[in-house]
């Protein structure tokens, strides 16, 4: 069959279009494969060492280790600066590993999730005194420097800027203790981030129920003869007993009603809590609980430059919404927003913070807000 010039031209166009389409499909497939590979890649863990580190109170450590984990890859803009870094900060007596559970990875880090690690470079440090970072139980015990929350933030800042070479974070997300650290970041390093998302705290000092349980646990441990001034040979029983009682205060009333519906289930709950508590070190607990003594960001709230979306929970007995403390304090912060989540299926009081599916929508809204043009 003889083709006309017009038919030949049309055939070439069709073949060209098919080739482009095939290439586009292949590229999309490659991009999808790369994204899946990035998400499925194991977290990278490292330990930053700071020699002769001086704490805010003047005490020093010859060598301080700050452990951290990263997810995803750093992305550089046209100026060569990393522009997709998100710092996520854990709660008291936890570590960055607590944010790597399947629940967190699915709700926050999976493809299409708010902090999709195919798009963001996520940094999960172990705060000083926690996880695999330097802490009293490493050997110094009660001779370990008395760190505060301010020291935690200073070390996180050194990690981000000096070790990872990041001049500005896209966001900081902090949970409970990490929530307070996020407020401190915004106050101490106002140009270091685009926004912060503090979850489950107030920007004002710890008071009331939250302060009392800390003092009660510390007092119980220090009053125990087995504590021996911090030089114990076996963990003081008071540490386990004290931390077991804390669960009554931080868990949600509806959840406890369900978990302790019978004597048998209540006993099982107590055994479970005790089994978790025996894995902690008494000195580490004391240091972690007393570290909050220097927390008060109220004096600098009016100077915060970052966008702020604070998230609290209506059934959190540590940070009672009826006190209206968050509403009062956040008015001082320029342009800040807040959400107090109502009680819903899955709510767990203060521990709602550990259920990211409950606040993933707020995280998505927060990132959309950061993306808005000024």
Predicted regions and their residues:
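Catalytic-loop region of hydrolases
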Residues: 31-87, 96-98, 102, 374
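N-terminal cap/lid subdomain of alpha/beta-hydrolase-fold enzymes
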Residues: 69-138
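Conserved acidic catalytic loop of the alpha/beta-hydrolase fold
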Residues: 150-170
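Catalytic active-site module of serine/aspartate enzymes centered on a nucleophile-bearing elbow/loop
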Residues: 336-374
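Alpha/beta-hydrolase
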Residues: 38-40, 45, 216-318
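Conserved hydrolase catalytic core segment
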Residues: 168-207
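Flexible "cap/lid" loop of the alpha/beta hydrolase fold
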Residues: 197-228
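Conserved loop-alpha-helix segment in the C-terminal half of the alpha/beta-hydrolase fold
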Residues: 309, 314-337
């Amino acid at each position: 069959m003889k083709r006309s010039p017009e038919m030949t031209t049309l055939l070439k166009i069709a073949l060209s279009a098919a080739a482009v389409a095939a290439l586009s499909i292949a590229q999309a497939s490659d991009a999808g494969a790369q994204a899946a590979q990035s998400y499925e890649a194991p977290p990278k863990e490292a330990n930053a060492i700071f020699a002769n580190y001086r704490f805010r109170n003047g005490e020093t450590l010859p060598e301080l280790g700050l452990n951290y984990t990263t997810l995803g890859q750093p992305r550089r803009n046209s100026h060569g600066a990393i522009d997709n870094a998100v710092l996520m900060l854990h709660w008291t007596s936890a570590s960055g590993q607590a944010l790597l559970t399947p629940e967190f990875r699915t709700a926050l880090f999976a493809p299409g999730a708010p902090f999709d690690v195919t798009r963001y470079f996520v940094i999960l440090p172990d705060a000083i005194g926690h996880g695999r970072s330097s802490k009293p139980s490493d050997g110094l015990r009660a001779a370990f420097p008395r760190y505060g929350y301010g020291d935690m933030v200073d070390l996180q800042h050194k990690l981000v800027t000096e070790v990872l070479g990041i001049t500005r974070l896209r966001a900081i997300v902090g949970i409970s203790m990490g929530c307070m650290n996020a407020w401190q970041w915004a106050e101490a390093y106002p140009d270091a981030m685009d926004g912060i998302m503090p979850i489950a705290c107030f920007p004002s000092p710890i008071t009331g129920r939250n302060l009392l349980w800390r003092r009660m646990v510390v007092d119980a441990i220090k009053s125990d003869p087995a504590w021996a001034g911090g030089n114990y040979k076996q963990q003081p029983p008071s540490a386990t007993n004290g931390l077991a009682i804390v669960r009554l205060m931080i868990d949600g009333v509806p959840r406890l009603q369900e978990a302790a519906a019978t004597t048998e289930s209540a006993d099982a709950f107590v055994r479970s809590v005790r089994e978790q508590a025996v894995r902690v070190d008494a000195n580490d607990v004391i240091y972690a609980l007393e570290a909050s003594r220097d927390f008060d960001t109220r004096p600098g709230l009016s100077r915060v430059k970052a966008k702020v979306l604070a998230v609290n929970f209506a059934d959190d007995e540590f940070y009672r919404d009826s006190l209206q403390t968050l509403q009062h304090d956040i008015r001082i912060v320029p342009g800040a927003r807040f959400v107090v989540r109502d009680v819903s299926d899955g709510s767990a009081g203060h521990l709602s913070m550990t259920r990211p599916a409950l606040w993933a929508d707020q995280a998505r809204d927060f990132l959309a807000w950061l993306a808005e043009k000024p």
